[in-house]
Amino acid sequence: MYRPAIGRPRVLLVVSHPSVGAGLETIFRLERRYEVRRAAKLAEAASWARAWPADLALVDALLLRGGARANLGVPALVLAAGASEAAAAEQYVDKPGGWVAKDSAAADLVSAVERLLTRPAEASAGSLALFAIGALLVVLLALLLYLMWTAVA
């Protein structure tokens, strides 16, 4: 489940190519705003996701070829060569948050990560609201039954 970052946002990089991964890690570390971990495989990323809950994952589309799934439990940006590769890869991410081009400038990459980290959470009905609606329905049903009973009697 997505948790808004209280301290420094945690970014999990999932990139198989060592040089590309090191470059991305350097970009985020130079910002001095993020905690960064890097995984070279999806299985390693899933292990990191359990041990080190990230706020966002940046996943290389190449790792998602052949139907491999990235079930990381956090919003994920897909790092892709183009829109068609991104669209194909996003279906294999459990919480897609868009994509960023592999040839993006460092500032654009950081900006895409910031947009995803700061977007408002999806609204959902809380348990108290659901309980109140359920209680209201029970009361209305009881009232309807009472009115039907008094009309027959």
Residue locations for each model-derived region?
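Conserved acidic segment of CheY-like receiver
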Residues: R8-S19, L24-F28
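A generic structural motif
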Residues: E31-R37
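Acidic, metal-coordinating helix/loop segments flanking the phosphotransfer/catalytic sites
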Residues: A40-L56
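Active-site residues of response regulator receiver
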Residues: L58-L62
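A short, hydrophobic beta-strand element within the central beta-sheet of small alpha/beta folds
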Residues: G73-A86
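Alpha4 helix (beta4-alpha4-beta5 surface) of REC/receiver domains from two-component response regulators
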Residues: A83-W99
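C-terminal output helix
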Residues: S104-V113
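C-terminal single-pass membrane-anchor helix
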Residues: A121-A153
